[in-house]
């Protein structure tokens, strides 16, 4: 049965509202929609955005001279647990399929932020203002942060490398670049319109982002 010939409304427009688009917020408009299908597509879109869009996150951390997360570092204000929590908040964009390592090497007095992270060009640091730790005069901190692309959530046990170095601290990871999704259905004269409001953890390339959504929805 040809649904279009039967008058069934198939979405023809899926675009971001350019007037409200920022690095951390976007409004996605989908129209036209068959009456009664707005909530169905909205819920499906919300699930896809929160669990199926690929992003990059930290999966492991190695700090020179530290063997486990319950350690402290001489000359550093934060203990290792606090440093891990701060490193988890870092956001990256990776252009590589596999794991990538980025490094930090500083000498105090210094406040370590995302801007201190050195990369090889295949990984972009998006949260350069993210605070990591404060280092006192005379102290030195060297860190290696492992970044990987993925989808959804991965626990630390899954990120732990079998037979890997004992001084690498595995971390749980939230890969999704989307932090929050709400949607609203508007009933127009002959069809429905859905607006999805997205809060993003990091910048997402708009064209690639839309392509990923369409592939998942088969629209």
What kind of feature is each model-predicted range?
Residues 1-219:
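Protein-protein interaction/assembly regions in multi-subunit complexes
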């Amino acid at each position: 049965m040809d649904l279009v010939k039967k008058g069934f409304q198939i979405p023809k427009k899926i675009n971001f509202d350019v007037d409200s688009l920022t690095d951390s917020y976007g409004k996605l408009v989908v129209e036209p929609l068959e009456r009664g299908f707005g909530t169905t597509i909205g819920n499906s879109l919300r699930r896809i955005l929160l669990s199926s869009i690929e992003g990059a996150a930290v999966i492991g951390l190695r700090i020179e001279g530290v063997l486990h997360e319950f350690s402290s570092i001489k000359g550093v204000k934060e203990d290792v647990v606090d440093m891990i929590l701060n490193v988890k908040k870092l956001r990256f964009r990776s252009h590589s399929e596999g794991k990538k390592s980025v490094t930090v090497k500083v000498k105090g007095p210094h406040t370590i932020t995302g801007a201190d992270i050195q990369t090889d060009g295949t990984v972009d640091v998006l949260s350069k203002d993210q605070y990591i730790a404060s280092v006192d005069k005379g102290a030195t901190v060297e860190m290696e942060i492992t970044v990987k692309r993925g989808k959804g959530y991965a626990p630390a046990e899954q990120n732990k490398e079998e037979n890997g170095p004992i001084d690498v601290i595995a971390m749980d990871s939230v890969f999704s670049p989307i932090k929050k999704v709400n949607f609203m259905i508007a009933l127009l004269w002959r069809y429905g319109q859905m607006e999805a409001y997205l809060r993003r953890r990091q910048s997402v390339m708009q064209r690639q982002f839309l392509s990923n959504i369409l592939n998942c929805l088969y629209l």
